[in-house]
Amino acid sequence: MNGTEGNNFYVPLSNRTGLVRSPFEYPQYYLAEPWQFKLLAVYMFFLICLGLPINGLTLICTAQHKKLRQPLNFILVNLAVAGAIMVCFGFTVTFYTAINGYFALGPTGCAVEGFMATLGGEVALWSLVVLAIERYIVVCKPMGSFKFSSTHASAGIAFTWVMAMACAAPPLVGWSRYIPEGIQCSCGPDYYTLNPEYNNESYVLYMFICHFILPVTIIFFTYGRLVCTVKAAAAQQQDSASTQKAEREVTKMVILMVLGFLVAWTPYATVAAWIFFNKGAAFSAQFMAIPAFFSKTSALYNPVIYVLLNKQFRSCMLTTLFCGKNPLGDEESSTVSTSKTEVSSVSPA
């Protein structure tokens, strides 16, 4: 065995070294140099300083500007809420524990932090799925002239929270558990042990299939169809500047959406899968820590991709930041409704 399993923890170092101590009681400087913990604290502070204002500004703008409270924008607000949860309940805890060099909040704090971080991440993930389905329905029109209402948008948001809870809650009630991971400063599901008391294997398989593979499949299918539909419409209307513009905007958004998701979560999922299928194999604490902390950046660039590239949100944000005046002038605002109509009115060939 190349790791040490204890009460609610697993340290990726054999206790034959005599160095292993509980990550809830002692600094873990035998896993990584003290400067690495300080670097992690600086990194988390950076994410907090950027993530909280960006996500908070999205929520403030939506509250201030009535025109943003449209059904197709509800899911973007949900993304901001998910990002704020990750920042407030995940990043701040990791910042504190990194400064201390160990998970100083104990097993209960670990369970709460792991739950909130997983919940926020899963709400964001399923929000992307709902966003993909919404745009597929609006652009590809598989159900004909479907009017997307507030009821549909609210149902989509409720769905994201139900799916997120279905992933994040089981470890709190005995199906798997939340334990410190990486350099023991943040918590996540137990991919590491075969403890039959917690049925870790069945939970991890459920999580990978239902909360990673399934969402990825849906996202790729819906956006693949969306791009094909827009390209087909543009090919039939080659002289239409508006259709060409719609094609460019939608294609750019699709590429950024898919890349953003894969860049954030694929390294973490890949490493977790490797650890799960290679129980007992030797690996360093940094091997899991780096992708785990890198995935947290999704809370930062999600609003950049899904909100700041939305002309309507961008215009309102600038108006809010500059006390009611848009420094870019009226041109930015005037193109909002036109662009929205262009992308939404593309019909299948």
UniProtKB/Swiss-Prot annotation:
> One of this protein's Pfam families, by short name?
7tm_1
Post-translationally, this protein is described as follows, namely:
Phosphorylated on some or all of the serine and threonine residues present in the C-terminal region.
* Signal peptide bounds: none
* Sequence positions bearing N6-(retinylidene)lysine: 296
Membrane topology, as annotated, equals: Multi-pass membrane protein
Family matches, as Gene3D superfamilies = Rhodopsin 7-helix transmembrane proteins (1.20.1070.10)
Keyword presence, Cell division: no
Q: Which GO terms describe its biological process?
A: phototransduction; visual perception
Region entry Disordered, spans: 329-349
Q: Transmembrane ranges?
A: 37-61, 74-99, 114-133, 153-176, 203-230, 253-276, 285-309
The alphabetical list of record keywords is:
Chromophore, Disulfide bond, G-protein coupled receptor, Glycoprotein, Membrane, Phosphoprotein, Photoreceptor protein, Receptor, Retinal protein, Sensory transduction, Transducer, Transmembrane, Transmembrane helix, Vision
Q: Name one GO molecular function term.
A: photoreceptor activity
Q: List the disulfide bonds.
A: 110-187
* Carbohydrate attachment residues: 2, 15
Q: In which tissues is it expressed?
A: The color pigments are found in the cone photoreceptor cells.
Q: What is its subcellular localisation?
A: Membrane
Topological domain, Extracellular: which ranges? 1-36, 100-113, 177-202, 277-284
GO cellular component terms, A-Z? membrane
Q: What does this protein do?
A: Visual pigments are the light-absorbing molecules that mediate vision. They consist of an apoprotein, opsin, covalently linked to cis-retinal.
Q: Which family does it belong to?
A: Belongs to the G-protein coupled receptor 1 family. Opsin subfamily.
Would you tell me the protein name for this molecule? Answer: Green-sensitive opsin-2
Lineage, uppermost ranks: Eukaryota, Metazoa, Chordata, Craniata, Vertebrata
